[in-house]
Structure formats: C-alpha cells, structure tokens
C-alpha cells in the first residue's frame, strides 16, 4: 500500500498485489527515513499486528538510499507496478541533476510505436503475442542501445547504403567490404542469380562515416561470408565457393571462378559462414547442418556443424573440429587457438585437437563447449525465441579482442557473440584452464531495447575497434515453421527452409563501430602497395588484423625479398 504518494520516489507508482518472500523487519533505523509503502496485515495467521514498513527512502550524508522488500519471488517481477517502483526509486536516488539529464534524453528520443499483427509467433505462450514494433532511424535506434562505460557507439553506415549486412571483411587498404543479402532467407534461385551484392564502403575524409559506396559484385544470391586471398575475395555462395577479382583497377569484379562446390543448399541459415584467413595460410570457416558433400583432390568429403579449412585455390579441404549443432561462429586468438559458437545454446567452443590429427579412420573429441553459463542478458522483456528461452538461440560469430584498442582487461580475453534474438551482442571472458580454456559469461557488450537491433557479425577492424553488422530486422527466427499448436498461427515454409513472414524486412541495415575512449590511434592505416620491409614490420602490429594482412600479402605476392628479414626475425625469436 502506498502511504506517501507525493514523494518523487513514488512517481507513477500504483499499488500492486503479488506473491513474495521476505523476512520480518526488526530494529528499524528510523533516523532520516521516510516510509513510502507498507505491507498491510494479511489477516488471521499473519505474524504482524500492524502495517509493516515495506518501501522507504533515507538520506545518508549527501547520498540517497532507496529500499524495498519486494523482489525475492519472480512473480513480483512480472508486475508492471513493481517495474515502475524500481524505476522511480532509481531516478530519485541518482539525484536531481542526473534525473534532469535523463528526462531531457527521454524527451529527445523517438518513442517506440507498436501494432498488433496476427503473424508474430508466440512460442513462449504469452497471454497474447508481442505486438509488431515499427523500425527506427539509425540515430534513434542508437538511443535505445547501450554500450559499456568508456565505450561509445558510432554509426558508420546505414540504409540505403547498406541493407541486410551478413558478413564483414577489410582489404589491405583498410576499406570495409560487406556481403549484403536481401534475398535471405527464402529467395533462392535455381540459377543462383539474385539481388545480392558485395559492396566496398569507404570513409574518404576521415570523419568516421561511410561516404563512398562501390558495388564490387552483384547478381549474387544469398552470399553468407567473404575473405581476401590471391588479390581477390573468396565468397561463400552455396553450393559453391566463388573467387572474385578485379583485374583493371575499377573496383568491379571481372573474374568469377568456382573454386569449390558441394555446400548444402537445404537451409540458408545452416551453410558456410565466418570465412577468415588462417595462421597456416589456409582459409578457415564454419558450416552448419546443411553440411558439405563433394569431392576435393580426388577424395570424397562429407561433414557438417563445425569448423573447416580450405586451401585458397580450393585444391584441398579438411574438416577440423566437430561441434554439436548449427554452427555460425569462428574466431582466433593471437596464439592461433581456434574458438567458435553455435546457433543453438552453445555460445562458446574451444577447438582443441583437430580431426586431421587422428589417423587410420579413428575419431576423437575435437572441440568442447566451454561456456560456463549459456544465458544471455537482454535489456528488454520483448524477446521472441523458439526454444532454449533466455539462452543463446541464434549465436553468431566468436571474434576476440585482438588489438590494443581495447582496455587491458579485454585484450585476448573477451569474445563477442551475436545474440540477435535478444537484441544484443554478448560477451564471454576466455581464460586458460588445464590444456584448454573456459568461457565466463560477461553479460552483453551491446544491448538494445529496439526490437529490430540484430547483431549478426562482429569483427575487429583495421583501426582496432570492434565493428558490428546490425541485420536490423524484426524477424530473426528461421525455423521451425509456426503452427497454431506451436507458435500460435499457421505459416508456410519457404525455399530456404525458413518460415515465410511478411514482416521480414528488406530495407534496413546498419554498420557500427564500438570505440574505447582510451584507445591509441592505429599506427597502420594501409598496407596497399607496402614494401617488403613495411610488411615485415607490420608483423609486429598490436592488431592481429594487420599481422594477418601482412602475412597474407607476403604469401600471396610471393615476397621472396622479405625472406632475409623474416629469417632474422625467427633467429631473434620473433
């Protein structure tokens, strides 16, 4: 019961009734205390004879203290009145100046707008399905998105320059290349010609924003990843891997070759992804349950749900690490250790002994789930999932903080896993244990109350900062297909094995940078046209991106002139 409704800490608070657990309070300190709510006597059998102080505020020197006995039982947290009580109490506690700043910020933020629709799945069996939230402009969406203290979120590009970004990579000049797929998930074409593109996004004036967009390749159909090799790019484009190259300097692909084929087409969210150049000069990647089945170098290969590597020309392909479900995450630390994530409740794997180490057809454990806690931590209750509720059900990526542009506590420790169904980019702290690693849940690196915020890729860029591809879409769920018995309405399954939903968006997309305010400026801006000596020097960069880029250029371009300097580095223990 509210007994001091006029107090600022009771602003907007209404009385509520809920089950809860608490201890009877004794020896109350009534000094400088104002009681705001009481628990009334429940009737016969209650161990109190008069209303019990339940919620109060106190002053402590220049500080303010807010207390409520509510909150032990989860049923209290379902009460909107309790939410308002906490909000009002916090805003009073932080002081008038902070409260005014908050009010000004909220007044300047576009409100979220909703509409009830009959084609939004309700696997959680809520009393009513969640309503449809209308999209926000990028700058307004950022106002609903939180980053850790000391980091700031910066917008690099948004629609119409980029739509539905699914993969990020940078060339030796530091330019961002993006795989864009408006055809995902169901518009698969028999001839594999579609509406998708590979774009080059550049910041030509150094203000941190994209101001030049070049379409490198178009007519693609659901490309899911790209990486650089042999002067061009390798693109995952099931059933093939394509090699695309510009030979005349106009930033347009005029070479298109199939270097590998056999990737499954049965499900567009279970194919190859996360391509990246490896320490061993092979191309590494992840693949889900759509699997691979084909012949490479005269050998029949068949594998799925794990990590593979491929020679850059496609002449060899090896399955390295077996995961236990649909895989869409891969990352390296600076020691060359391999990590990954899956879409279904396994946000962090460590890849130990590769499958290629087992001889004579023997099989052994090649990867282990190391996350000590699988839950994610959204900042909005409006979460729509199919199963494994409140856990990672769309885990994507596993990049690590491999540059000096992160705080010391992050470097080589923090891994970033997309959780688009929770509208967040999760974070795990990786630490050695025994012969492997463990991953401690470090909550969210980014989290948004905008239900469209959908981080599907996060990578450390040439500036050392973390770059994030925001798919920005209201519908993330791929399958199963909703039915009246499960999901609340009958839907159809599309060609990509995803349920058909008119709320899937094909008009938005964002690329963000998350910048640590204490980060040093990158010493390297570009390795385009770099000399042998410059490439060897770049192997000492404090950013793994530049070390790998220098290594790739030395190998791809056959820089034999660098051999003496490389031998000297090896002899010196470098």
Role assignments for model-derived ranges:
Residues 1, 72, 270:
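Histidine-centered active-site/metal-ligand motif
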Residues 528-537, 559-571:
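Amphipathic alpha-helical scaffolding segments comprising HEAT/armadillo-like alpha-solenoid repeats
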Residues 6-10, 14, 83-95, 333, ...:
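Non-catalytic, well-ordered alpha-helical segments in soluble enzyme domains
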Residues 542-543, 573-574:
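Short inter-helical turns and helix N-cap capping residues of alpha-solenoid HEAT/ARM repeat scaffolds
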Residues 43-52, 59-127:
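Extracellular ligand-binding/catalytic regions of CAZymes and related secreted enzymes
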Residues 2-62, 69:
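Catalytic beta-strand/loop cores that center a nucleophilic Ser/Cys/Thr
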Residues 108-534, 545-556:
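Beta-propeller domains with acidic blade repeats across secreted/periplasmic ectodomains
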Residues 8, 81-88, 534, 549, ...:
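Extracytoplasmic/secreted proteins, especially bacterial periplasmic and envelope-associated proteins
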């Amino acid at each position: 019961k509210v007994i001091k409704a006029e107090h600022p800490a009771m602003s907007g608070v209404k009385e509520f009734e809920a089950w809860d657990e608490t201890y009877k309070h004794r020896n109350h300190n009534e000094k400088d205390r104002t009681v705001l709510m009481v628990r009334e006597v429940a009737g016969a059998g209650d161990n109190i004879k008069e209303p019990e102080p339940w919620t109060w505020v106190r002053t402590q020197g220049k500080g303010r203290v807010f207390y409520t006995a509510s909150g032990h039982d989860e049923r209290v947290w379902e009460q909107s009145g309790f939410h308002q009580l906490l909000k009002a109490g916090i805003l009073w506690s932080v002081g008038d100046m902070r409260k005014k700043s908050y009010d000004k910020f909220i007044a300047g933020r576009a409100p979220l707008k909703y509409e009830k629709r009959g084609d939004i799945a309700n696997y959680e069996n809520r009393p009513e399905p969640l309503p449809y939230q209308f999209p926000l402009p990028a700058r307004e969406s950022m106002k609903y998105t939180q980053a850790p203290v000391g980091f700031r979120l910066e917008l690099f590009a948004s629609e119409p320059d980029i739509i539905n970004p699914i993969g990020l990579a940078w060339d030796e000049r530091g330019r961002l290349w993006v795989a864009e797929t408006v055809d995902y998930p169901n518009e698969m074409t028999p001839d594999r010609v579609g509406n998708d593109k590979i774009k080059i996004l550049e910041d030509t004036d150094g203000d941190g924003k994209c101001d030049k967009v070049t379409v490198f390749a178009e007519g693609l159909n659901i490309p899911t990843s790209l990486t650089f090799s042999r002067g061009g790019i390798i693109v995952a484009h099931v059933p093939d891997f394509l090699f695309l190259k510009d030979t005349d300097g106009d930033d347009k692909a005029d070479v298109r070759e199939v270097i590998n084929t056999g990737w499954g087409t049965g499900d567009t969210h279970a194919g190859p992804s996360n391509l990246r150049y490896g320490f061993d000069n092979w191309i590494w990647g992840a693949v889900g349950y759509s699997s691979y089945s084909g012949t490479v170098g005269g050998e029949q290969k068949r594998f799925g749900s794990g990590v593979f590597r491929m020679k850059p020309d496609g002449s060899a392909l090896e399955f390295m690490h077996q995961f236990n479900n649909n895989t869409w995450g891969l990352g390296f630390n600076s020691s060359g250790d391999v990590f990954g994530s899956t879409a279904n409740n396994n946000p962090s794997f460590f890849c130990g002994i590769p499958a290629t180490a087992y001889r004579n057809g023997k099989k052994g454990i090649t990867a282990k789930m190391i996350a000590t806690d699988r839950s994610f931590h959204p900042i909005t209750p409006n979460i729509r999932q199919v199963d494994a509720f409140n856990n990672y059900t769309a885990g994507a990526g596993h990049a690590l903080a491999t540059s000096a542009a992160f705080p010391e506590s992050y470097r080589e420790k923090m891994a970033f896993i997309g959780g688009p169904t929770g509208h967040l980019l999760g974070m795990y702290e990786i630490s050695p244990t025994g012969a492997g690693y463990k991953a401690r849940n470090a909550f969210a690196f980014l989290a948004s109350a905008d239900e469209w915020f959908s981080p599907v890729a996060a990578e450390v860029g040439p500036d050392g900062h973390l770059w994030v591809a925001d798919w920005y879409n209201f519908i993330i769920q791929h399958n199963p297909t909703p039915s009246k018995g499960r999901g609340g309405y009958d839907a159809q399954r599309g060609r990509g094995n995803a349920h058909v939903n008119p709320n899937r968006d094909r008009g938005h997309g964002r690329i963000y940078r998350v910048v640590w305010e204490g980060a040093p400026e990158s010493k390297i801006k570009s390795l385009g046209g770099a000399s042998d000596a410059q490439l060897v020097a770049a192997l000492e960069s404090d950013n793994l991106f530049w070390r790998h880029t220098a290594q790739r250029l030395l190998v791809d371009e056959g820089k034999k002139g660098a051999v003496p300097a490389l031998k000297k580095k090896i002899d010196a223990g470098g």
